[in-house]
């Protein structure tokens, strides 16, 4: 995931335990543990498959929307030109983009719980050929993923 515009808090490693958004965001309606970070433009996060993460307290404040046209499972294009579709995306508010390794299987925008019990499928994401930031460097995914 990479932050393109704005700032936000991101909580990693714990799931919500309450349906109330205020309670699960700022109260105790979530699992114990996890970490919270302040994220800003240029920050990049690489997460192991299946890691819970939640973005909140975004700035500037705007209504939530998917960055790309579609339903969160693929990019809808006019014709078949994904590059043209992406070039026309307007960035505003807090914008973060996510990606999966090439050949890493089906991706989706999950809002929580959809993949419960599907651990083998979630954890079977193959080791990528390149780290998205560090390429094949030992310090990146290629050297650290064992």
What are these regions (language model features)?
Residues 1-17, 46:
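Short, conserved beta-strand element in jelly-roll/cupin
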Residues 38-59:
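Conserved metal-binding segment of the jelly-roll/cupin
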Residues 25-26:
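PEST-like low-complexity intrinsically disordered regions enriched in Ser/Thr/Pro and acidic residues
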Residues 2, 8, 39, 52, ...:
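Small-side-chain structural scaffolding
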Residues 16-18, 61-62:
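Short, surface-exposed beta-strand-loop junctions and turns on beta-sheet-rich folds
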Residues 11, 19-20, 54-56:
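Short, solvent-exposed loop/turn segments at secondary-structure junctions
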């Amino acid at each position: 995931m990479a932050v393109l515009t704005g700032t936000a808090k991101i909580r990693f490693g714990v799931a919500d335990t309450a349906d109330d958004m205020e309670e699960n965001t700022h109260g105790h309606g979530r699992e114990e543990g996890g970490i919270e970070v302040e994220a800003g433009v240029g920050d990049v996060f690489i997460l192991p498959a299946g890691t819970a993460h939640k973005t909140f307290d975004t700035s500037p404040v705007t209504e939530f929307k998917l960055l790309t046209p579609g339903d969160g499972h693929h990019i809808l294009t006019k014709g078949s030109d994904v590059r043209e579709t992406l070039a026309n995306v307007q960035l505003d508010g807090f914008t973060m983009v996510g990606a999966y390794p090439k050949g890493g299987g089906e991706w989706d925008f999950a809002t929580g719980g959809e993949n419960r019990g599907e651990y083998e499928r979630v954890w079977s994401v193959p080791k990528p050929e390149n780290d998205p930031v560090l390429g094949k460097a030992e310090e990146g995914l290629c050297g650290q993923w064992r």
